[in-house]
Amino acid sequence: MSDDIHGDIHLPVLLERCIELLAPALQEPGAVIVDATLGMGGHSAGILARFPQATLVGLDRDPDALAIAGERLARFGDRVHLVHTVYDGIREALDGLGIAEVQGVLFDLGVSSLQLDRVERGFSYSKDAPLDMRMDGTSDLTAERVLAEYPEADLRRIFRDYGEEKLAARYAQRIVAARQQGPITRSGELVHLLQRATPAAIARQGHPAKRVFQALRIEVNQELAVLERALPAAVDALAVGGRLVVESYQSLEDRIVKRELQTRSRSSAPAGLPVELPEHRPELRLLIRGAELADDDEKAANPRAAPVRLRAAERTRASEDRRGS
């Protein structure tokens, strides 16, 4: 972007579409939008500029991202509140600010541009770096520790479940054998090991490290477990008429998002009940049928949008246990 204050800031994915989906909920005075995955603040800057009456609560587990976003969003003054937390801490973050409910929540899931582009973070299999992969550098678990300490069965499970890797058993076995000779500390070492363990026919189908690196990143940061807690918390934080927008980038995330939104957009009335009681009515109304993908123009302008799956919903009724009800 031409007005970026940092050279490594990239175009936010589907910004205009996210704004369009959030707009009906953010028109009212005093509207609060939670950017649950703040990153470097690209989506937030666009939203705050478009809705001058809105207040932002930005959450991120990465202190580096918070620092960059804080500088980028400084021009919006006291309309911005940034919180260092993982996004399943949304309720606690809002309570700390004295906010009972919000008009919008945005999730832009997965690894951020900042984390991918900074080689020393170890997220990329295309550059040699320490095997770190922590989104929050203050946390303890690293990819190096996972490779050094996890039993073979756990490595196999992680590669299979989080990477959907067909060679999970083979890779886990080779890693355990290799670490007997010395620790695997760098991404280049791991890539070389995986390449040697991959049959040529399979290697031609794609980079052998892609799924393993995804699996390690998800394990280190507990991304799927956090998402499963964060989505219900986000829905519960929405005021009636508030909107939730979620961008996911791989099928494991999208399945969780799809399940949560579909479940809460259906009646919970028991089968055979002659009348649907108010407490059984759907809490959400889906705003998009299925998942929306980036069009060719978006992908050409912003290649990072290629794998995105966008889902959105509107809050239609409050939970029975909503505070203040």
Swiss-Prot record:
<feature type="region of interest" description="Disordered">
    <location>
        <begin position="295"/>
        <end position="325"/>
    </location>
</feature>
<feature type="binding site">
    <location>
        <position position="87"/>
    </location>
    <ligand>
        <name>S-adenosyl-L-methionine</name>
    </ligand>
</feature>
<comment type="similarity">
    <text>Belongs to the methyltransferase superfamily. RsmH family.</text>
</comment>
<dbReference type="GO" id="GO:0070475">
    <property type="term" value="P:rRNA base methylation"/>
</dbReference>
<keyword id="KW-0949">S-adenosyl-L-methionine</keyword>
<dbReference type="GO" id="GO:0071424">
    <property type="term" value="F:rRNA (cytosine-N4-)-methyltransferase activity"/>
</dbReference>
<dbReference type="InterPro" id="IPR023397">
    <property type="entry name" value="SAM-dep_MeTrfase_MraW_recog"/>
</dbReference>
<protein>
    <recommendedName>
        <fullName>Ribosomal RNA small subunit methyltransferase H</fullName>
        <ecNumber>2.1.1.199</ecNumber>
    </recommendedName>
</protein>
<feature type="compositionally biased region" description="Basic and acidic residues">
    <location>
        <begin position="311"/>
        <end position="325"/>
    </location>
</feature>
<keyword id="KW-0698">rRNA processing</keyword>
<keyword id="KW-0963">Cytoplasm</keyword>
<keyword id="KW-0808">Transferase</keyword>
<dbReference type="InterPro" id="IPR029063">
    <property type="entry name" value="SAM-dependent_MTases_sf"/>
</dbReference>
<keyword id="KW-0489">Methyltransferase</keyword>
<feature type="binding site">
    <location>
        <position position="60"/>
    </location>
    <ligand>
        <name>S-adenosyl-L-methionine</name>
    </ligand>
</feature>
<comment type="function">
    <text>Specifically methylates the N4 position of cytidine in position 1402 (C1402) of 16S rRNA.</text>
</comment>
<feature type="binding site">
    <location>
        <position position="115"/>
    </location>
    <ligand>
        <name>S-adenosyl-L-methionine</name>
    </ligand>
</feature>
<feature type="binding site">
    <location>
        <position position="108"/>
    </location>
    <ligand>
        <name>S-adenosyl-L-methionine</name>
    </ligand>
</feature>
<feature type="binding site">
    <location>
        <begin position="41"/>
        <end position="43"/>
    </location>
    <ligand>
        <name>S-adenosyl-L-methionine</name>
    </ligand>
</feature>
<dbReference type="Pfam" id="PF01795">
    <property type="entry name" value="Methyltransf_5"/>
</dbReference>
<dbReference type="GO" id="GO:0005737">
    <property type="term" value="C:cytoplasm"/>
</dbReference>
<dbReference type="InterPro" id="IPR002903">
    <property type="entry name" value="RsmH"/>
</dbReference>
